[in-house]
Amino acid sequence: MFVDHVKIYVKGGDGGDGMVAFRREKYVPNGGPAGGDGGHGGNVVFEVEEGLRTLMDFRYKRHFKAPRGEHGMSKGMHGKNAEDLIVKVPPGTVVMNEETNAVIADLVEHGQRAVIAKAGRGGRGNSRFATPANPAPELSEKGEPGQELNVILELKVLADVGLVGFPSVGKSTLLSVVSAAKPKIGAYHFTTIVPNLGMIETDDHRSFAMADLPGLIEGAHEGVGLGHQFLRHIERTRVIVHVIDMSGMEGRDPYEDYLTINEELKQYNLRLTERPQIIVANKMDMPDAEENLTAFRQKVGEDVQIFPISAVSRQGLKELLFAIADLLEVTPEFPLYDEVEEQSDATVMYKHEAKGEDFEITRDDDGTFIISGYAIERLFKMTDFSREDGIRRFARQLRAMGVDEALRERGAQDGDTVRLQEFEFEFVD
């Protein structure tokens, strides 16, 4: 498929920190813990907006970070949860994890949403840790960091205008001079082997997406040449621009080319013939082109509008682009009935990858034991090491998870260095 492609960074909002606080009211001596919880961060959510056509906006903004939750407050007041960050994407956007190439979401329908980066939960305040043995704990949690990752967005482009015609009639040249697209251009058939997309803006500031599709040949509806894939792509377009080589230099008759291409469109799917079609007579700067155009007009009829142009010399391009923009304004979207069968019964909305083991122990070249893993790193990030109670709780949780025992099994002895992210401590058996 013909895709737009961009890499971006997304990060869910961090949770707010829990607070250590105590009641200090008049006539209430020795007040208990009163620290509130932090609020949850915001998710990064992608939402399909049917009015969008390309990923061009992501070329200029590549970082999306949801807001963090509010910190907990005294008097048991919890921090406010953050709002989700909603990012609009065009229909047909596929979101993939850059590191694993796993598909996170396939977004196809207007209004469809998918959580791309999960928010962190808020840390608990000290009122959550009160026990009969420790009724006034100086202990709270930091907010959980939000999920962060680099993702790749690929768009199955829904072009407004599709350029069709035999190979080497000048479709790629036309696209290259009316847009910033840089398709491969060569004096041989099938130079274009993948579709190219160009964004066009007319002098009166109307814009549309134009696709240069690989050349069609007789039998394309049966898969001959570059076949079904690109005929299917024409089906996504609203207007077809039929480019014909009027120079006759390929040894073909322009009128026969015109009939052959239209027959292929008809044979592939009758609905393709419902698309408005603009006929473009290209290479009018070549010898014999005027004579061939006169003969062509006589065969198709004087009531059929033809736009004579030269993509190389840019003759007639302004009038052509205005005509295309005018036609798009009055042409509705065409439903893609055939694609319903290709989609799965349940559209992919959201998929998290497995979080893996709680912890893993490896050994560095210098003999240091390295602890890693989703659960233990999450615990580390949410621990407030500036407070003695926080350090003690962290040590208790390591023992409860079996980290001490696992270190002994790996040969750890008194005084050995153990590292967890940027934190180093000595192992005590």
From Swiss-Prot:
GO biological process: ribosome biogenesis
Region (Disordered): 119-143
Needed cofactors: Mg(2+)
UniProt name for this protein: GTPase Obg
Function: An essential GTPase which binds GTP, GDP and possibly (p)ppGpp with moderate affinity, with high nucleotide exchange rates and a fairly low GTP hydrolysis rate. Plays a role in control of the cell cycle, stress response, ribosome biogenesis and in those bacteria that undergo differentiation, in morphogenesis control.
OCT domain mapped to chain residues: 351-429
Signal peptide positions (record): none
Location within or outside the cell: Cytoplasm
Annotated keywords: Cytoplasm, GTP-binding, Hydrolase, Magnesium, Metal-binding, Nucleotide-binding
Family, similarity comment: Belongs to the TRAFAC class OBG-HflX-like GTPase superfamily. OBG GTPase family.
GO molecular function, one term: GTP binding
Pfam families: DUF1967, GTP1_OBG, MMR_HSR1
Domain Obg, chain residue ranges per copy: 1-158
Record-listed Mg(2+) binding positions: S172, T192
Domain of life (superkingdom): Bacteria
InterPro entries, A to Z: G_OBG, GTP-bd, GTP-bd_Obg/CgtA, GTP-bd_prot_GTP1/OBG_C_sf, GTP1-OBG_CS, GTP1_OBG_dom, GTP1_OBG_dom_sf, OBG_GTPase
All copies of domain OBG-type G, residue ranges: 159-329
Protein EC: 3.6.5.-
Binding sites annotated in the UniProt record for GTP: 165-172, 190-194, 212-215, 282-285, 310-312
GO cellular component: cytoplasm
Subunit structure of this chain's protein: Monomer.
Upper lineage: Bacteria, Bacillati, Bacillota, Bacilli, Bacillales
Primary location: cytoplasm
